[in-house]
């Protein structure tokens, strides 16, 4: 049975990591990872610590450990991510999976 997530709003607290000059959040809670597994490599609306942007979800399966969802954060906001990384370590992450047709997919179709 496939779970349809269109129009879904998910919230979690996730660690904020730095990898090279990029920042990322990793959704590691198994329930959330399973829900988002079918959204691998899809662009969704993401709000990290109150900062909204369009991001791509990446389903990762490491050789050791448990699968997780990785979201790279916009590089142009590195100043914000650096401050959050040093002060908080974990941030509130909201993932909004939009309904079909909200981005103009069905515009003008009768």
Q: Where are the regions that the model predicts?
A:
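Exposed beta-sheet edge/beta-hairpin loop segments within beta-rich domains
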Residues: 79-85
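Long, compositionally biased stretches
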Residues: 1-65, 85-110
């Amino acid at each position: 049975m496939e779970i349809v997530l269109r129009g879904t709003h998910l919230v979690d607290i996730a660690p904020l990591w730095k990898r090279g000059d990029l920042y990322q959040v990793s959704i590691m809670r198994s329930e959330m990872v399973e829900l988002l597994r079918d959204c691998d490599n899809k662009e969704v609306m993401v709000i990290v610590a109150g900062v909204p942007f369009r991001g791509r979800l990446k389903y990762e399966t490491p050789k050791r450990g448990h699968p997780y969802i990785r979201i790279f954060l916009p590089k142009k906001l590195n100043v914000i991510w650096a401050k959050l990384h040093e002060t908080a370590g974990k941030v509130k992450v909201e993932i909004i999976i939009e309904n079909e047709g909200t981005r103009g997919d069905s515009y003008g179709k009768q």
